[in-house]
Amino acid sequence: MSGDTGPPKQGGTRYGSISSPPSPEPQQAPPGGTYLSEKIPIPDTESGTFSLRKLWAFTGPGFLMSIAFLDPGNIESDLQAGAVAGFKLLWVLLWATVLGLLCQRLAARLGVVTGKDLGEVCHLYYPKVPRILLWLTIELAIVGSDMQEVIGTAIAFSLLSAGRIPLWGGVLITVVDTFFFLFLDNYGLRKLEAFFGFLITIMALTFGYEYVVAQPAQGALLQGLFLPSCPGCGQPELLQAVGIIGAIIMPHNIYLHSSLVKSREVDRSRRADIREANMYFLIEATIALSVSFLINLFVMAVFGQAFYKQTNQAAFNICADSSLHDYAPIFPRNNLTVAVDIYQGGVILGCLFGPPALYIWAVGLLAAGQSSTMTGTYAGQFVMEGFLKLRWSRFARVLLTRSCAILPTVLLAVFRDLRDLSGLNDLLNVLQSLLLPFAVLPILTFTSMPALMQEFANGLVSKVITSSIMVLVCAVNLYFVISYLPSLPHPAYFSLVALLAAAYLGLTTYLVWTCLITQGATLLAHSSHQRFLYGLPEEDQEKGRTSG
């Protein structure tokens, strides 16, 4: 896959590809090992034909990636969208999942074609300052996601124990379960992937059960799913749509998927093998995200049926008249619309459909939190290794990430109430949306570079679609910031927001600039940024082939 693209020299410097050696030789495992220490062989089959054996060999990375579409942040976003808008935002969920699939397709393609993940490519192409800032934003996204997993798991333990396990106790339990997953990882890659498949199955069965007992109106559901409209919607519904996009398309997941696909042995000296790997990974990702979409649909439909336009007084009466009457006081006795969260959601399901519905909901929520734990650990490890060439053991990495996530969460759990914890979950969903450009812009940049991707670079249609995604995300984020400013508690906060906004816009502008260079705006390419047109300078090519 080596070779120059474009002019062989530019300003006296030779540019070219960074592709690693094409032979699928296993890499040396770093201290403590990683998911990529084991390579899955691909069976030989007749060329040009579809093979279920090959699809099975490629199956795994897409399902691990899809777990980010099912974490507790997504579950909370789903139930709130159902409670606020009924079935009206189902089409947003559908198209957000489709857009997520398009982004993940680019991530998988980058990993397959170059043999490097997005973090490694960023390390080679971006200068030091933007590279470090980019790394920090993705680490922030990972910690934010981990906090959501901690919150979801703690609430699940509280529901399963009927409140006997306090929220802070559930938060601390998540430390123990994380190291259980690290222990499980020692049993091999395929067993780990199978275990995550088992957790996804639990979510499908538990949330599917809630869907069956709730019996949503199918006609209204199909209308909300396929008719892109929202009659009678206002700012609450629009902000909820923003939350759906932020929860579904998560920035660190793009970095994660580009690394996960490297676990399969693909002979990158053969274009046919690369093309075949891209096809099978796309099929697998489509299947995985279809499953995740159905699970999210179950949750949104259940709460669209059970909670839409429900008042606090009505929820109180329902619980007071049920076998779970002890939970009734969590709903204020007023006529305001219920501000539902993942805790109240489980309670009202139990009040409406019996205690089994509450416990089954809690099991599904627990599976969502647990399944997200390990993928977040891997994402953090891959991002750190890619951006910084700093290799830590999984133990050290998970200790750092989980410590950053647990400290603020346990403080909230001890000194504040459940509503503050759920409110933090909502804020973290918005944070993911705000940080999304720092994943989508780099993946669009590098997959559009012929010098890097050669014949597998984005075509015109792909560039238009992914660029439209980026414009949509930026517009949504701008709308959120404008809507959020009036809610700041004190004018002094405006200066802090202005400072953060300046840094945010500065980094985003730089990433847009480099992205435009790869889209054909050659006049923007100066000095060291010629590499975004022609590839790495000759002196950096060998470093690019041997790094990682």
UniProtKB/Swiss-Prot annotation:
Topology relative to the membrane: Multi-pass membrane protein
InterPro entries, A to Z: NRAMP_fam
Entry keyword Cell membrane: no
Pfam families: Nramp (PF01566)
Extracellular side: 74-82, 161-164, 215-237, 305-346, 416-426, 486-493
GO cellular component: endosome membrane; late endosome membrane; lysosomal membrane; phagocytic vesicle membrane; plasma membrane
Keywords: Endosome, Glycoprotein, Ion transport, Iron, Iron transport, Lysosome, Membrane, Transmembrane, Transmembrane helix, Transport
GO biological process: one example: manganese ion transport
Region (Disordered): 1-38
TM spans (from-to): 56-73, 83-102, 140-160, 165-184, 194-214, 238-256, 285-304, 347-366, 398-415, 427-447, 464-485, 494-513
Record topology, Cytoplasmic segments: 1-55, 103-139, 185-193, 257-284, 367-397, 448-463, 514-548
Main localization, broad class: membrane
Location of the protein in the cell: Late endosome membrane; Lysosome membrane
Catalytic reactions of this protein: Zn(2+)(in) + H(+)(out) = Zn(2+)(out) + H(+)(in); Fe(2+)(in) + H(+)(out) = Fe(2+)(out) + H(+)(in); Mn(2+)(in) + H(+)(out) = Mn(2+)(out) + H(+)(in)
Hydrolase listed as a keyword: no
Residue positions the entry lists as glycosylated: 335
GO molecular function ontology, one term from the record: cadmium ion transmembrane transporter activity
Biological role: Macrophage-specific antiporter that fluxes metal ions in either direction against a proton gradient. Localized to late endosomal lysosomal membranes, delivers bivalent cations from the cytosol into these acidic compartments where they may directly affect antimicrobial activity. Involved in iron metabolism and host natural resistance to infection with intracellular parasites.
Similarity-based family: Belongs to the NRAMP family.
Protein name per Swiss-Prot or TrEMBL: Natural resistance-associated macrophage protein 1
Organism: Bos taurus
Gene, per the UniProt record: SLC11A1
